[in-house]
């Protein structure tokens, strides 16, 4: 298999994407347009579809230290949903997370829940997906290491064929402005 050379660009991107999920969610192009409308500085890296951190590790990214891993979890009563966003090289122990943050027992949310709440498929989970959470059910638990200099984070634009690099503070502001809660958490 040939090596894929992703490229990075500033601002908008002229590609079409197909939204295979809910019709009311922001697709990749709409995310780019939304970020431009908010006058945010961002950078885009296009790459083949990736469904795991192992697959993403095979892609040459401009800021691999800022790439995010996202875990969409729920409590045992399916009342509370959390998006745990950590640096890509970290592991999250859900039992330790639950104990430290006082949640009920946590497990991974189903693909159906992911689609119903954030309009995403497995492999495309991203903090930008909470912009599709009309009921503001998802609380984002963001690894505080993303706040350290240079304060950059790489997340999917609701599609696993690209990574958007933006300031962590801008991402927090977007999510908060939408009405979802953002927690800064320490993940060892």
Give the positions of each predicted feature.
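Extended, low-hydrophobicity, polar/charged segments
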Residues: 2-4, 9-188
